[in-house]
Amino acid sequence: MIDMLVLRLPFIDSLVCSRLSGNDLIAFVDLSKIATLSGMNLSARTVEYHIDGDLTVSGLSHPFESLPTHYSGIAFKIYEGSKNFYPCVEIKASPAKVLQGHNVFGTTDLALCSEALLLNFANSLPCLYDLLDVNATTISRIDATFSARAPNENIAKQVIDHLRNVSNGQTKSTRSQNWESTVTWNETSRHRTLVAYLKHVELQHQIQQLSSKPSAKMTSYQKEQLKVLSNPDLLEFASGLVRFEARIETRYLKSFGLPLNLFDAIRFASDYNSQGKDLIFDLWSFSFSELFKAFEGDSMNIYDDSAVLDAIQSKHFTITPSGKTSFAKASRYFGFYRRLVNEGYDSVALTMPRNSFWRYVSALVECGIPKSQLMNLSTCNNVVPLVRFINVDFSSQRPDWYNEPVLKIA
């Protein structure tokens, strides 16, 4: 699916001026004039107040703002113009979220995704929209996302852990950008950045963030989004999903042969897809091809202790003052259980204070795990090919109840 689309709409020629900067001819617009014509608010780096009451403003700029839609927001920013940036308005959003309120799955239709951004933008800011040469709109970035499905969240987490050490050729893991449920490769690349993450974890985090807001302070689209995200069928479909996201910049799009002009790209996509192919899936495959070669022949040791984890969490949890459920203690007990599996009962007993060891053993026994079982745990020799869990089935990216979204204008 198209998970992010970034478009740049240049200003009409009559508003664009030019100036020399060294040997470079810089195109720019007068932001104060744009603000007057469009009614937009600007920020100023410096404001000087004179004793006669006059104000002198300099360093005008436009910060990113968010336009509300039915389900989500569209970010936009006015760029004055610089050596490497033609004066334009940049708009960016997740078309999936704009169209349906979530990005667990979604469409690969470039025309529909572009329409969702452009029509909502035109409807919200018609005066600014009229100042732009819409036919010259260019694509700045496309995020193409597809998912592999692990048997459960426990195994999906192990896949992410294993991927942290995978790289190939010019595709390097960016360790500073890795979190517990996310791995990033080539984070600073001007060509493409690759990301793998657990969708169910992200979805739960989004629900938690929205639920924590007082109802009176929630926008209408946030309320709609929370309603969509809380769908039990959606949560069930997201469970076990390992997402592979390619954030594709203009240089990489050009190397694939995709025109950067939006409307040329839409025609290109239509012709491409008419041949029984899918442009977005092939762009995604092209982006991940180097990394996926590293998966060939690689294997990982998989353990599935989800039933044990469920038993521990059902017994050892606390309710925080804010009313949330904390499984911090359960996580420590499960970590101890994994040590018993990997190192053996006697070995762990020798390396822990006696009182702590027996306290942890007693906690596991309380969960219904017999002590005799704890004394005879061993790592199962369950080494499986990594590609078994990185099998991205294009035909099963959406549930059977999926319908292509219909555009709604806020």
UniProtKB/Swiss-Prot annotation:
Signal peptide: none annotated. GO terms for biological process: DNA replication; rolling circle single-stranded viral DNA replication. Its EC number is 3.1.21.-, 6.5.1.1. It comes from the Viruses. One of its GO terms (molecular function) is endonuclease activity. Keywords: DNA replication, DNA-binding, Endonuclease, Formylation, Hydrolase, Ligase, Nuclease. InterPro entries: G2P (IPR006516), G2P_C (IPR022688), G2P_N (IPR022686). It catalyses: ATP + (deoxyribonucleotide)n-3'-hydroxyl + 5'-phospho-(deoxyribonucleotide)m = (deoxyribonucleotide)n+m + AMP + diphosphate. Belongs to the inovirus G2P protein family. Isoform G2P plays an essential role in viral DNA replication. Binds the origin of replication and cleaves the dsDNA replicative form I (RFI) and becomes covalently bound to it via phosphotyrosine bond, generating the dsDNA replicative form II (RFII). In turn, viral DNA replication initiates at the 3'-OH of the cleavage site. After one round of rolling circle synthesis, protein G2P is linked to the newly synthesized ssDNA and joins the ends of the displaced strand to generate a circular single-stranded molecule ready to be packed into a virion. This is Replication-associated protein G2P.
